[in-house]
From Swiss-Prot:
Belongs to the CD225/Dispanin family. This is Transmembrane protein PMIS2. InterPro entries: CD225/Dispanin_fam. May play a role in spermatozoa mobility. It is a multi-pass membrane protein. Residues 1-61 are annotated as: Disordered.
Amino acid sequence: MALKPPSATQPAPNAPATPDAPPTTGDPGASAAPGSPTTTGGPGAPAEVPQEPQEPTQTPEELAFYAPNYLCLTIFAILLFPPFGLAALYFSYEGSWTQKPTSMLPPLQTMKANQNSEWEEAYINSGRTGWFGAFVVMIGLGIIYGLVLY
């Protein structure tokens, strides 16, 4: 029986894995260069490093449901009336008064809820941040207006 030549999709048995790689010999004890890591897969070879789990990707339909985070409005509220602006920043994520407040910024919490596809939480937090930020901006502008007039 005649031997068939290797097909175009199969590499030759002694061909290098890549065009730039040096040809390998059949001797598993020989190393390619001093100081280079061994990749023979033998018992003395280092274990492969496990890859980090990838974040789940979102479909275009899910990306369309992103809730706005009102980051500029929150920053504007802090600049116009810092006492309530900081309160808006701190308390806007709290669902009810029985929950303990968290120290993460509300716009960042909205972004995180958007990334985790927690739409209900993202929209509740987004609405709370927007309304409180708008309220604080109106108070700040009212105080400035009152100070300028009187």
